[in-house]
């Protein structure tokens, strides 16, 4: 059987770093208040000339180089983002042009913070269906440009960045010891769409709008939804939390991460945390955390890695991958 194996990984961050203390002159907050409630200490903010496309292209180049490939080897460019450069054409097409890719196809996918999980799952389906051999999967965001910088409950939470992986078709044996994606589960529930959303768009207000969030409601639902979809992945494979080498969750809030790991009985030392230095980068969150753990040597070939995310909609999902 065909498996989708991670061949390469890369990331990119804006130059500017904004620390918690930098917010003290903008809104009524403090470093202590932010750290206690979120675990965030700093985040990267896009500056002039830095966009979702430029960050996504930089991460993509790094992933292709890490894979030992050329841009011409890529069949599909799949970008998860909620902050595209333009309403259309797709920012994935712009990245395709930046990389000099003239074959295959490219499109954007939008599932907010769950976007990268949705994108990996979609890429896996294209690979196993024979429509693509190598897929560039990117999560890239510039959430700083949809924030209300007078709202202290949201402006301190988010950052900008991009991460990317190259997925490649490989022969597997149908075993959980195979390298590649072993299971993926996605969910959504539109009944919660007004708990986390942007209050504008081309079809309604003809404006970009700002991010709005009912933080307590999001927190209340997050842990249960995350653990439910992860347990479905365990059930599909016969694996358990004890088999997990690394848990790479969406980096939204350390309290949510800690509560999810505890409910799943995943040891703290197996959890990859980057929310302290990146903040919530939405669809870029999981690939940025993955890239960090690969670069520092924690995630190694053969490791069983659990990815998960939850975002506006609500959308949520999980992926089990043998590295």
UniProtKB/Swiss-Prot annotation:
It comes from the Bacteria. This is Beta-ketoacyl-[acyl-carrier-protein] synthase III. Keywords: Acyltransferase, Cytoplasm, Fatty acid biosynthesis, Fatty acid metabolism, Lipid biosynthesis, Lipid metabolism, Multifunctional enzyme, Transferase. Homodimer. Its EC number is 2.3.1.180. One of its GO terms (cellular component) is cytoplasm. Residues 251-255 are annotated as: ACP-binding. Pfam families: ACP_syn_III, ACP_syn_III_C. NCBIfam families: fabH, PRK09352.1. SUPFAM superfamilies: Thiolase-like (SSF53901). It catalyses: malonyl-[ACP] + acetyl-CoA + H(+) = 3-oxobutanoyl-[ACP] + CO2 + CoA.
């Amino acid at each position: 059987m065909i498996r989708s194996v991670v061949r390469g990984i890369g990331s990119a961050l804006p130059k500017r770093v904004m620390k918690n203390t930098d917010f003290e002159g903008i809104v009524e907050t403090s470093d202590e208040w932010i750290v206690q409630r979120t675990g965030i200490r700093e985040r990267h903010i896009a500056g002039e000339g830095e966009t979702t496309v430029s960050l996504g292209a930089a991460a993509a180049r790094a992933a292709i180089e890490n894979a030992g490939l050329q841009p011409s080897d890529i069949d599909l460019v799949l970008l998860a983002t909620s902050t595209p450069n333009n309403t259309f054409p797709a920012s994935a097409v712009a990245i395709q042009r930046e990389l000099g890719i003239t074959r295959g196809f490219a499109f954007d996918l939008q599932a907010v913070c769950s976007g990268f999980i949705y994108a990996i799952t979609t890429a896996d389906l294209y690979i196993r269906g024979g429509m693509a051999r190598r897929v560039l999967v990117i999560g890239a965001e510039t959430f700083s440009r949809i924030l209300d910088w007078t709202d202290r409950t949201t402006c301190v939470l988010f950052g900008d960045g991009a991460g990317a992986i190259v997925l490649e078709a490989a022969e597997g044996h149908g075993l959980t010891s195979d390298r590649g994606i072993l299971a993926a589960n996605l969910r959504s529930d539109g009944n919660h769409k007004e708990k986390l959303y942007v209050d504008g768009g081309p079809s309604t207000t003809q404006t970009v709008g700002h991010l709005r969030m009912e933080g307590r409601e999001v927190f209340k639902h997050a842990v249960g939804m995350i653990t439910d979809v992860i347990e479905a992945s365990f059930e599909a494979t016969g694996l358990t939390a004890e088999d997990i080498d690394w848990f790479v969750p969406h980096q939204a809030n350390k309290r949510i991460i800690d509560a999810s790991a505890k409910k799943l009985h995943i040891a703290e030392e197996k959890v990859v945390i980057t929310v302290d230095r990146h903040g919530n980068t939405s669809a870029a969150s999981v690939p940025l955390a993955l890239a960090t753990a690969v670069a520092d040597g924690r995630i190694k070939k053969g490791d069983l890695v659990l990815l998960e995310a939850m975002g506006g909609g609500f959308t949520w999902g999980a992926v089990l991958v043998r590295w």
